């Protein structure tokens, strides 16, 4: 069994240093791995990333993370990633990594994802070059998920870590008019094709906790949704089959 502590939209800053450091100090005894689903900082400033880096530096369990839209706002996303990587965080950007956790081979595919909407209201590949580039960017994110899942196909457990939502079910609760900005069902296509045991994302602060891609569970782990610093998932499985238990808050 692997215990996964997941959180999205931590929005670290100097103002939240105490809460962030306390949350990470407590979680080590409750989890085997930590997954962070983007919006690691408030506005993407390196000084804000340093707060999270300080909290992660002495963590003895693996920490995986993807960036979110807030982490790009200041134009310093590369610096944010570098600071966290220097502190030992496995930063995933259209990439995948495998590691041994609790006696099992865990594979994590991580990328930010992007916008585009869901059936009934989607951005088409049509019109001005800027709009078509948005469509193309989401396609590149989906392609990265597919490639990552190919790379971790032999892992005992496979997780997809995103910021933007791949299903509309987990953004329900947000105004319908902004669903197109909260994710894209195109991100779900490679997950449905190649399979995964668990999909995690954030971004939709007023969204819903649970959805599915076929039989694959999808969870919105934004702290505003879970109401806790971390949510613990218990995964038990063997290659080709797994069971996910939602243990609860930590």
What role is predicted for each listed range?
Residues 11-16, 41-46, 70-80, 98-101, ...:
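Active-site environment of divalent metal-dependent phosphoester hydrolases
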Residues 1-62, 72-79, 131, 135-138, ...:
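N-terminal active-site segment of His-dependent metallophosphoesterases
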Residues 10-12, 78-179, 222-224, 235-237:
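Conserved catalytic scaffold of divalent metal-dependent phosphoesterases
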Residues 6-8, 34-39, 63-69, 90-95, ...:
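Active-site neighborhood of phospho(di)ester-bond hydrolases with catalytic His/Asp-centered motifs
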Residues 2, 32, 106-108, 157-159, ...:
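Alpha/beta-hydrolase fold active-site loops
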